[in-house]
């Protein structure tokens, strides 16, 4: 770019040779002067412009290449993340299913344990009731036996006299002797 400006300055300071000169006033410039200036600009600016465009092109290509590499890396990371997400979701589903199964199993175990405890309590209750019934029955038997014995003794004492009492004793002693082996 500097070369173009220097060339234009050089041409503008060139001494005029009669009818040919550079008109620096843009409003008074004619088509020939403009075409000469454009020709000079194209001639001298071609290399600079070409270099600028080549540099810009290489920067754009590098940027595109870097972007493509970043995109590929991001795509790879996305695929890895999706694979990891799939594994995590699968593991979560397994944990959820195992958790539900374990909850159901614990529930069944608790129900079985509660049923066993209830049966054990029922058996214990029945045993206690049976024991208490037997105890009451034994007490009633004892009381009935005692009352019957008391009644029998009272009847005997009222009905028996001494003579009958002695005969009864002798009779029972005779029976006992008959049963006794010699």
Swiss-Prot record:
It comes from the Eukaryota. It is a single-pass membrane protein. The chain crosses the membrane at residues 31-53. Keywords: ATP synthesis, CF(0), Chloroplast, Hydrogen ion transport, Ion transport, Membrane, Plastid, Thylakoid, Transmembrane, Transmembrane helix, Transport. GO terms for molecular function: proton-transporting ATP synthase activity, rotational mechanism. It is found in: Plastid, Chloroplast thylakoid membrane. One of its GO terms (cellular component) is proton-transporting ATP synthase complex. Its main location: plastid. The keyword tRNA processing does not apply. Pfam families: ATP-synt_B. InterPro entries: ATP_synth_b/b'su_bac/chlpt. PANTHER family: ATP SYNTHASE SUBUNIT B, CHLOROPLASTIC (PTHR34264:SF3). F-type ATPases have 2 components, F(1) - the catalytic core - and F(0) - the membrane proton channel. F(1) has five subunits: alpha(3), beta(3), gamma(1), delta(1), epsilon(1). F(0) has four main subunits: a(1), b(1), b'(1) and c(10-14). The alpha and beta chains form an alternating ring which encloses part of the gamma chain. F(1) is attached to F(0) by a central stalk formed by the gamma and epsilon chains, while a peripheral stalk is formed by the delta, b and b' chains. HAMAP family: ATP_synth_b_bprime. F(1)F(0) ATP synthase produces ATP from ADP in the presence of a proton or sodium gradient. F-type ATPases consist of two structural domains, F(1) containing the extramembraneous catalytic core and F(0) containing the membrane proton channel, linked together by a central stalk and a peripheral stalk. During catalysis, ATP synthesis in the catalytic domain of F(1) is coupled via a rotary mechanism of the central stalk subunits to proton translocation. Belongs to the ATPase B chain family. In plastids the F-type ATPase is also known as CF(1)CF(0). This is ATP synthase subunit b, chloroplastic. It comes from Welwitschia mirabilis (Tree tumbo). The gene is atpF.
């Amino acid at each position: 770019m500097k070369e173009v400006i220097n060339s234009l300055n050089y041409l503008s300071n060139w001494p005029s040779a009669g009818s040919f000169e550079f008109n620096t006033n843009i409003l008074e410039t004619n088509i020939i002067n403009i075409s000469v200036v454009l020709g000079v600009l194209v001639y001298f600016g071609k290399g600079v412009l070409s270099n600028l465009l080549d540099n810009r092109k290489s920067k754009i290509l590098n940027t595109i290449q870097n972007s493509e590499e970043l995109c590929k890396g991001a795509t790879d990371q996305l695929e890895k993340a999706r694979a990891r997400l799939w594994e995590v979701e699968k593991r979560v589903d397994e944990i959820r299913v195992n958790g539900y199964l374990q909850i159901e199993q614990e529930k069944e175990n608790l129900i079985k344990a509660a049923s066993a405890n209830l049966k054990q309590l029922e058996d214990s209750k029945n045993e206690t009731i049976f024991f208490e019934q037997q105890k009451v029955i034994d007490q009633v038997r004892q009381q009935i036996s005692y009352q019957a014995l008391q009644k029998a003794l009272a009847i005997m004492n009222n009905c028996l006299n001494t003579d009958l009492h002695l005969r009864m004793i002798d009779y029972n002693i005779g029976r006992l002797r008959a049963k006794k082996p010699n």
